Amino acid sequence: MAEFVRATIFGTTFEITSRYTELQPVGMGAFGLVCAARDQLTGAPVAVKKIMKPFSTPVLSKRTYRELKLLKHLGHENIICLSDIFISPLEDIYSVTELLGTDLHRLLTSRPLEKQFIQYFLYQILRGLKYVHSAGVVHRDLKPSNILINENCDLKICGFGLARVQDPQMTGYVSTRYYRAPEIMLTWQKYDVEVDIWSAGCIFAEMLDGKPLFPGKDHVNQFSIITELLGTPPDDVIETICSENTLRFVKSLPKRERQPLTSRFKNADPEAVDLLERMLVFDPKKRIRAGEALAHEYLAPYHDPTDEPEAQEKFDWSFNDADLPVDTWRIMMYSEILDFHNIDQSEDAGQVLVEGVGDGQQAFAA
């Protein structure tokens, strides 16, 4: 049975197994607190994320289950890797991943990026997206703060909590809005993997220019800024808008011509601008795919078709439309944790799952 140790960080109780020491806070988000720590078992630095109140509502329970199941399924060099997960006696969930020194947001606010770094970072983002998309997963919340980087410039995508969910009206954060594809922002239609290509294009533009490409104050202003650069959406794209209010708004905007990106990115290589043009296209069906982008001339120094793998199997989304009570999500989550630790879900283990609280939970700790 694992021994748990408590510490108070930012006024929050952090309750982890004694395997992890030297806790240092590195980030706080709407859904959790992240601390750097030392793994006593391996000696490696790790990131420990406390998912706060995962069972407080069915929506949060489902979100936590989705992120956990995704991290278990996805295994790729450019995707954050889950190394441990456990439930504390206070019934909080803690996930442990490798620790990378910084993220792209911090990097972009500290200094301009040189060409070779921009190329290498974009290559790794697209390499990760090719794998994720082949698994039938849409990240949907790609932004610089969800792109982790270490001192060797190795890059890993994180933040899969919102992956492939219909817009829950909780995504008005400024940092997220800047990278949002127009088809999500204005809920035009069902969306697919192309939304991540748009986000990657916005991130690419920010790496080239040193500042966000579309810094809208709200969704209306955001869309207006997009049309100032990319012009009015084509008629066949406008016709896909289902909402009458959205359709009225789009048609009320003044007609604008697409501006050549070469005038906006005067110091960028022509190959870089060409790739960006192919990523920032209003019509999702005409946006370049991740695999195609990897083969673009701009990324030739890094492109290796023999080392850009796809997922071996699709992710199982059968749970995603389920409307279940908290207790059911809790049992499903416990089952996933037992599976992660290769614990036989015998009759005894099942009894522990049903109990769900108290000392029995410590059996799930690594």
UniProtKB/Swiss-Prot annotation:
The modification Phosphothreonine is found at residue 171. It catalyses: L-seryl-[protein] + ATP = O-phospho-L-seryl-[protein] + ADP + H(+); L-threonyl-[protein] + ATP = O-phospho-L-threonyl-[protein] + ADP + H(+). The keyword Glycosyltransferase does not apply. Dually phosphorylated on Thr-171 and Tyr-173, which activates the enzyme. Activated by tyrosine and threonine phosphorylation. One of its GO terms (molecular function) is ATP binding. Residues 20-299 form the Protein kinase domain. Its main location: cytoplasm. Belongs to the protein kinase superfamily. Ser/Thr protein kinase family. MAP kinase subfamily. HOG1 sub-subfamily. The TXY motif contains the threonine and tyrosine residues whose phosphorylation activates the MAP kinases. This is Mitogen-activated protein kinase hog1. It comes from Aspergillus glaucus (Eurotium herbariorum).
